[in-house]
Amino acid sequence: MSTGFFGDIAKIKYEGPESTNPLAFRHYNPDDVVLGKRMEDHLRFAVAYWHTFVWPGGDPFGGQTFERPWFKDSMEAAKLKADVAFEFFQLLGVPYYCFHDADVRPEGRNFAENTSNLNAIVDYFAGKQGETGVKLLWGTANLFSNRRFMAGAATNPDPDVFAFAAATVKTCIDATQRLDGENYVLWGGREGYETLLNTDLKRELDQLGRFLNLVVEYKHRIGFKGTILIEPKPQEPTKHQYDYDVATVYGFLKRYGLENEVKVNIEQGHAILAGHSFEHELALANALGIFGSIDMNRNDYQSGWDTDQFPNNVPEMALAYYHVLAGGGFKTGGTNFDAKLRRQSIDPEDLLIGHIGGMDCCARGLKAAAKMIEDKALSAPLEARYAGWNVPEAKKMLDGGFSLEEIEAWVLKSDVNPQPKSGRQELLENVVNRYV
């Protein structure tokens, strides 16, 4: 039954590249087969509950611009928001959604009320999932918005806050399992510091390590089959966050014995804030064996903060999905649109148009990436670039067959005198441009 929020808009359909209908897909056809798999199954699109249905359209210089009938802190409003959300998922035809606990339930007076409210809305969500077939990609806890978390959650100097946060995560994992969620995400929005003058770095890192171990231990104790994910971000809201980027997260996981238990959820905008490209973070996660999922969006390259816009750069998406596919594709992860409307985009249909454009952009990127893989457009030159490592002496240097002295003897005996070879960067850039 329609809520009426989206008026008479019908389910969004694929109309092909020639269509000029803003409420139609031009490139995303869920049933298109790409590399032997349906496009929908490759991309595994999800809608972010927080930006789509919770964000009021404010900025540091002005307040709410969006008028939504569910912008009230009550269970009745939470259920209306859920009705609109699941109607939206069906209009778009997305298979998944994601949420924080605070996105979906009214705020209670204490932990017990928060838990009761969350359980009530989870029951409601379970019914909506059964009616629509839409599934939960991942759940998470908001451990950054409430003032109790102003000095962090797991890294807070107050053990009561640590306990409150741990208990909250426990209830959110329970909710995720109840809804058959395929992952559980931890984003340390305030797990960092504003100044070192009042920060004990070692203590806070040890607290964070113990917190994450508690999560993993609980996952195994209750038999949760999903993947635990950390979402890296370098700063904002804190000056310096402990989950700065993929490399930092991997070092943290190794230190606390969690590198085989936890993977990463990589956001495009966070990669840019960290001074990296999106594809760098994806390629590194693959190389380290911790790639899990992505939050898809776009940052304004001039602003210097997290703008969370919808993706519209096809060449960038092509390289991103190239690395997703090269790593074997998503297992339990997917493409979550962690993107929000601009504050002047106040019409209900703007929510659909933003997601349609993002989904089309990702579809174009996926198809270009798949074609590059089929043609070995990048893998063949890469293999040729490193071909020298296939000779016996080169293999011995890496597998322990040569000591440093033996390498020296080989260099002298064979008169090894390496000559530079072109990296052919311009050629490879031109190759990529042929596909996008």
UniProtKB/Swiss-Prot annotation:
Note describing how the cofactor binds: Binds 2 magnesium ions per subunit.
Residues the record marks as active site: 100, 103
BP term (GO), one: D-xylose metabolic process
Top-level taxon in the UniProt lineage: Bacteria
Tagged with keyword NAD: no
GO annotations of cellular component type: cytoplasm
Catalytic activity: alpha-D-xylose = alpha-D-xylulofuranose
EC number(s) on file: 5.3.1.5
Listed GO MF terms: magnesium ion binding; xylose isomerase activity
Binding positions (Mg(2+) 2): 267, 270, 306, 308
UniProt subcellular location: Cytoplasm
Cofactor(s) for this UniProt protein: Mg(2+)
Keyword terms, alphabetized: Carbohydrate metabolism, Cytoplasm, Isomerase, Magnesium, Metal-binding, Xylose metabolism
Record carries keyword Metal-binding: yes
Residues reported in the UniProt entry to bind Mg(2+) 1: 231, 267, 295, 338
EC top class named in words: isomerase
Summary of subunit composition and partner proteins: Homotetramer.
Family: Belongs to the xylose isomerase family.
Record's protein name: Xylose isomerase
Source species of the chain: Rhizobium meliloti (strain 1021)
